[in-house]
């Protein structure tokens, strides 16, 4: 009998927050590069690509961490660790996902291929970075930002000032929200020697997260002023600022379940800013 439920959990399809956090920056880029009106074809290619590559990343991560996950309370029952899915099954799923992603990539300009290769290489390397880099979130930031240049290139645009601002916003955002995520497992990670910015930042974790959020949210103002955005952009910008404030409140006591909740709330920030970008470009 095929363990469909275990496959769904291995690919994290039951927890779509990872897909959303990869999709929103790509959507921001598609809207920016197409003046608010990306084609249906591009949307479908990038949306499916997001799902396939995020799922592939989860499989790669679980293959690399299958011996570590059993020592972390939050991950000890993942399908590979628990034996519900075999290692060979995981590799077959990974192969299928990468092939599906390649088929989508063939529909995009050749220059997208170079960024896709970088993305795949980083995705394979990232799980191992947690073992020797104090700030593996920097690597994750690169991996989760590759959809941005690909969206601009696929839309026939140069990597212009909009791209630079958006790349900085997303890279900073990833470090901030993944540090919140890492705060959830900090106690277990310290025991088994897994590294993260939550550990590296030590007692300055909340302050650094706050500074990162202020920086990235301010960059949106730079973009909006340059685009002569109307008042509704700023209304949504203020709403998003409220979401960031709520996240900082959640992580204040460093309670693991609240830190994880703060991470999940990042999805609302991405959604609100997607609406803000879309309205600003109408």
Curated annotation (Swiss-Prot):
It is found in: Cell inner membrane. One of its GO terms (cellular component) is plasma membrane. PROSITE patterns: UBIA. InterPro entries: HB_polyprenyltransferase-like, Prenyltransferase, UbiA_prenyltransferase, UbiA_prenylTrfase_CS, UbiA_sf. The chain crosses the membrane at residues 17-37, 40-60, 90-110, 113-133, 135-155, 163-183, 207-227, 231-251, 262-282. Gene3D superfamilies: UbiA prenyltransferase (1.20.120.1780). Pathway: Cofactor biosynthesis; ubiquinone biosynthesis. Pfam families: UbiA (PF01040). Its cofactor is Mg(2+). CDD domains: PT_UbiA_COQ2. Keywords: Cell inner membrane, Cell membrane, Magnesium, Membrane, Transferase, Transmembrane, Transmembrane helix, Ubiquinone biosynthesis. GO terms for molecular function: 4-hydroxybenzoate polyprenyltransferase activity. Its EC number is 2.5.1.39. Belongs to the UbiA prenyltransferase family. This is 4-hydroxybenzoate octaprenyltransferase.
